[in-house]
């Protein structure tokens, strides 16, 4: 981590701090820390996670959001910026309405935070884990593309601190809170571009649209065939009625002659 200044800031000063454009800062016990520029794989993993969580929340009609570049206050004068934050929609709307930096305060607790390891990986495994545990964040993921593993920290019932489970390549990582949210470790550690996923979904939607159009055309053809058959049946019935009427008339004529 890179300390910006030896002069300490309060949490309120941090909220209104105007640093270098494009640079993200954390606050650790009053010290301003410049976060390292993320690598390409770091960005891809974060974008992939946000995309998957948003799809999951939409599919299950959950009032939750997945956001990035959102800070979480962990101590009196400390604030961390997880790579991904999961919180309720109402909470996010409240934070969005506040002036200054987007920061979740003590009473604004996220449901899940995710860190993708980088140069300061020790902070993710030790210091940040302790801070997130201290403020009772229910679930904390550490995605480590260098060691090729994912650590999911959570607090089991009747336990006072985090325990964790690690997921390795070839396995599937599962959220503790969202049991149906399951991802391949291999895919998460080396994810596709979100743009490619969107293109695939668009292609699938177009294919489904074409299939629906074909089914609609087939239904229209069947309806036309049914109408033609109905017309033929009606014509045959009318023909039979005319024939029966003619036979009755002929029978009446014969009775008269006799």
Identify the function of each model-found stretch.
Residues 1-258:
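Gly/Pro/Ser/Thr-rich low-complexity, intrinsically disordered segments predominantly at protein N-termini
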């Amino acid at each position: 981590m890179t300390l910006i200044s030896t002069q300490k800031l309060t949490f309120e000063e941090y909220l209104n701090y105007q640093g270098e454009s494009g640079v993200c800062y954390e606050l650790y016990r009053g010290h301003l820390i410049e976060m390292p520029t993320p690598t390409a794989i770091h960005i891809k993993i974060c974008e992939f996670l946000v995309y998957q969580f948003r799809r999951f929340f939409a599919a299950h009609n959950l009032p939750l959001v997945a956001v990035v570049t959102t800070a979480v206050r962990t101590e009196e004068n400390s604030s961390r910026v997880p790579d991904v934050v999961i919180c309720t929609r109402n909470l996010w709307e409240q934070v969005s309405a506040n002036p200054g930096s987007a920061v979740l305060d003590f009473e604004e607790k996220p449901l899940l935070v995710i860190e993708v390891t980088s140069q300061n990986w020790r902070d993710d495994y030790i210091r940040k884990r302790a801070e997130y545990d201290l403020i009772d964040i229910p679930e904390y993921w550490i995605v480590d593309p260098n060691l090729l593993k994912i650590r999911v920290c959570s607090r089991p019932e009747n336990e006072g601190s985090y325990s964790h489970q690690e997921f390795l390549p070839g396995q599937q990582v599962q959220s503790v809170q969202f049991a149906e949210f399951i991802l391949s470790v291999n895919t998460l550690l080396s994810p596709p571009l979100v743009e490619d996923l969107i293109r695939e979904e668009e292609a699938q939607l177009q294919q489904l649209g074409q299939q629906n159009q074909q089914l609609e055309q087939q239904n229209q053809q069947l309806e036309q065939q049914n109408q033609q058959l109905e017309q033929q049946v009606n014509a045959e019935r009318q023909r039979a009625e005319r024939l029966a009427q003619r036979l009755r008339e002929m029978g009446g004529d014969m009775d008269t002659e006799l």
